[in-house]
């Protein structure tokens, strides 16, 4: 294991003892928020501390056992013992690298947030809108299966079903971390119901997954930088629909970003939702710029997450889904569309974590 990683582990070990002492402090016990934060950190550090202690003990055993190889009568037995110790040491090193990745300082801070999901129909006309509806159902069912709260922020229906565009909010602490790799272009291949010759048509949708940032962390938007338009809602809502201009359209003038919300009957609530989406988009755009400047690792492995990147193809006649970023194919399309999204999520997350482990083991840790 690299000296830089050992140094990092020793620093975390010292922090473990420090936090342990703090948790025994009566003043800390009176501060519930600080106690909660320290308890969470202690739980993370405990696993690292325990594993690192085990690694140190095995390393010491290797140092003690090694010189015994010089005894001809014990050589074979000692060599066998050393082989076992080195194998155990290698296993512990992999566990330590994984634990380091799970440490907050090495994770995307947005992973534990909720998220907004934007699905837009692309090329393919009515079929693209229908496919956008399929994707929305897929994400909705996944959220329901895992007891996440899902709220529709804005929806523009297609003329024959589905959606031209739909924006939803997933309220769960780990929603963004689970779904962030869904960003990009999704392509569908299937035979439309109106196709009399049985020909397969290709359509596409784009998906953007944006972290739901806490209000205090959102970028400040100057009133001079936005234009707010009101219009009558065109969605569901009974007699109230089209009687008042409760729907909101906000345009961010410096960037040209446009957000609409007509889900609520209250103009005030629609504006609040639209501003939340706009702020999250601006924050995501800033983060994307930083990622471009600082690192290309994620882009090289998993695509940039830009809407122009084709990340996945859904072939309905064959029941096949292919994730082009990692060359993963499954023939469980119907299950995925009905919400078993982990079939696709687990391989992509595992591939990403493997790449992080490689980068962590090859680079200096500060």
From Swiss-Prot:
| A Pfam family the protein falls into | RF-1
**SUPFAM superfamilies under this entry?**
Release factor (SSF75620)
InterPro entries reported in the protein's UniProt record: PCRF, Pep_chain_release_fac_I, Pep_chain_release_fac_I_sf, Prokaryotic/Mito_RF, RF-1
Q: How is it modified after translation?
A: Methylated by PrmC. Methylation increases the termination efficiency of RF1.
- Tell me which GO cellular component terms the UniProt record holds: cytoplasm
Highest taxon of the source?
Bacteria
N5-methylglutamine: residues bearing it: 239
First-listed, main subcellular location of the protein, grouped into a coarse class: cytoplasm
Where in or outside the cell is it found?
A: Cytoplasm
UniProt keywords, alphabetically: Cytoplasm, Methylation, Protein biosynthesis
Instruction: Please give one Gene Ontology molecular function term for this protein.
Output: translation release factor activity, codon specific
Q: Which PANTHER family match?
A: LD18447P (PTHR43804:SF7)
Its function, per the record, reads:
Peptide chain release factor 1 directs the termination of translation in response to the peptide chain termination codons UAG and UAA.
User: So what family is this one in?
Assistant: Belongs to the prokaryotic/mitochondrial release factor family.
The name under which this protein is listed is Peptide chain release factor 1
């Amino acid at each position: 294991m690299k000296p830089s990683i050992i140094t990092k582990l020793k620093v975390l070990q010292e922090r473990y003892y420090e936090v342990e002492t703090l948790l025994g402090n009566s003043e800390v016990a009176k501060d519930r928020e600080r106690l909660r934060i320290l308890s969470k950190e202690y739980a993370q550090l405990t696993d690292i501390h325990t594993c690192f202690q085990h690694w140190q003990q095995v390393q010491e055993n290797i140092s003690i056992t090694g010189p015994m190889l010089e005894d001809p009568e014990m050589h074979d037995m000692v060599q066998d013992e050393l082989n076992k110790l080195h194998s155990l040491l290698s296993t512990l090193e992999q566990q330590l690298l994984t634990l380091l990745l799970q440490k907050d300082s090495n994770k995307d801070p947005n992973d534990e947030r909720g998220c907004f999901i934007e699905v837009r129909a692309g090329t393919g006309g009515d079929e693209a809108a229908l496919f956008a509806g399929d994707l929305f159902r897929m994400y909705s069912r996944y959220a329901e299966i895992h007891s996440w709260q899902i709220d529709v922020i804005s929806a523009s229906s297609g003329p024959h079903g589905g959606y031209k565009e739909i924006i939803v909010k997933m309220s769960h602490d780990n929603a963004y971390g689970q779904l962030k790799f869904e960003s990009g272009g999704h392509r569908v291949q299937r035979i439309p119901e109106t196709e009399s010759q049985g020909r397969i048509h290709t359509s596409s949708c784009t998906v953007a997954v944006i972290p739901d940032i806490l209000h205090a962390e959102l970028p400040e938007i100057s009133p001079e930088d936005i234009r707010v338009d009101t219009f009558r809602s065109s969605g569901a809502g009974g007699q109230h629909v089209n009687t008042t201009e409760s729907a909101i359209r906000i345009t961010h003038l410096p960037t040209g970003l446009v957000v609409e919300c007509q889900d609520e009957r209250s103009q005030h609530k629609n504006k609040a939702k639209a501003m939340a989406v706009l702020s999250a988009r601006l924050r995501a755009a800033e983060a994307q710029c930083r990622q471009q400047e600082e690192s290309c690792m994620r882009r090289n492995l998993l695509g940039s997450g830009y809407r122009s990147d084709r990340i996945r193809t859904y072939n309905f006649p064959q029941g096949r889904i292919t994730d082009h970023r990692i060359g993963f194919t499954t023939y469980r399309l119907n299950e995925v569309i009905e919400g078993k999204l982990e079939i696709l999520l687990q391989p992509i997350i595992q591939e990403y974590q493997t790449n992080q482990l490689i980068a962590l083991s090859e680079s200096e840790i500060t």
